[in-house]
A protein has these predicted regions:
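Short cationic amphipathic helices and targeting signals
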Residues: 38, 142-147
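A cross-kingdom feature of multi-pass membrane systems that activates on extracytoplasmic/periplasmic
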Residues: 148-149, 158-170
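Extended amphipathic alpha-helical scaffolding segments in membrane-proximal extra-membrane regions
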Residues: 133, 140, 149-152, 157
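A structural signal for hydrophobic secondary-structure junctions
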Residues: 2-139
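Conserved active-site beta-strand-loop modules that form the wall/rim of enzyme catalytic pockets
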Residues: 88, 143-144, 170
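Short amphipathic alpha-helices in soluble, non-transmembrane regions
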Residues: 2-8, 157-164
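Conserved hydrophobic/aromatic pocket- or pore-lining residues that grip, position, or stack substrates
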Residues: 107, 144, 161
Length: 170
């Protein structure tokens, strides 16, 4: 993900574009285990939707120069795992070598969107954490999230975007 791709996608119907990467893991406490997906986002991520659904704490602040351990979890995960704002949570990952490794994160906030499938799975974290866990460099991402303006023909926008992205990225 770089400025070249971002400029290719400079279209009047696009509201925002963000690099994102995911990493599957397990949240483990003394009494519970819960499968999650870390959704790594960067400092420019548009938090407006999540902010409007924030029920306690704050949105984490990330920057390009350092890796943050701050995360945002859902109320569903917090309730199931008996976690709260300012708690440390250990998330376990399986590497390519099939070895497990745990990382400790600090819960900065709790959200509740009402979208059960998302709330059951996603923990927002620093994109640099997911890059490190995946062994990626600073330009690598899992996908890009494209938000369209209201009242845009999604099918037409999809067709335009599809032909603007280089084939090696599709």
């Amino acid at each position: 993900y770089d400025s070249t791709l971002k400029s290719r996608l400079d279209q009047p119907f696009i509201k925002s574009i963000f690099p994102v990467a995911n990493k599957a893991g397990l949240v483990k406490t003394d009494d519970e285990i819960h499968g999650v997906v870390l959704k790594g986002v960067d400092k420019d991520y548009d938090w407006s939707y999540i902010q409007s659904n924030l029920i306690s704490g704050n949105i984490p602040q990330y920057n390009d120069n350092e890796r943050s351990n701050d995360v945002l979890i859902s109320k569903i995960i917090a309730d199931k795992m008996l976690l709260d704002v300012n708690d440390e949570v250990r998330i376990w990952f399986v590497g390519e070598d099939m070895k497990t490794r745990g990382r400790k994160f600090l819960i900065k906030g709790i959200y509740e969107t009402g979208l059960t499938e998302c709330d059951e799975r996603f923990i927002y974290c620093d994109l640099n954490q997911v890059r490190r866990l995946n062994g990626w460099n600073e330009n690598m991402v899992g996908h890009i999230e494209i938000n369209l303006l209201d009242n845009v023909d999604v099918v037409e926008a999809n067709n335009i975007i599809y032909y603007k992205i280089p084939t090696n990225l599709i």
